[in-house]
Amino acid sequence: MPKLNYNAIAQGYSCDLVAEYLYSLGVKDMMVDIGEIFCDGVNPSGRPWTLGIDRPEDGNNDPGSQIQGIFKAPEGPHGIVTSGNYRKFYVRDGKKYSHSIDPRTGYPVQHSLLSATIVAENATLADAYATYCMVLGLEESQRFLASRPDLEGCLVYDEDGVFQTWCSDGFVLEEAE
């Protein structure tokens, strides 16, 4: 039986709260990862934070085990959040249903967009916009991101059974090794 879960931006908000606390202690270089990510500064090697974007394979429940691409976080504080339908879904009568509900229809979304990774000024906003993109679908998300210079995004979608990637101009995704 499907269950409703209302925590769409809770993890992003929690990252921001932890980051605020770390700032209050004088920490300048950080990566807060509690399901969603907030990062600022550099990693312990003095380089930009590097993140793997998970390949949206059904059942890929081990973050980092199957990587679609590598992303270097931009300078300054940012929230970096991925929403997708490859970990949270259900199957009924042989048909897969996403956990994302389109509020315009009241039904689970049905489109080719598999995951949306968003970079915003904080993790709360990134979380909200990643969820929003998962409701919009590929084409509407592309238009939305193109209209928002304050956001960067990477969309992974299914094109005839093959994973394809679309990234906004400022989101550089390198191939995973």
Residue ranges of each PLM-predicted region?
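Mature catalytic core of soluble alpha/beta enzymes
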Residues: 1-177
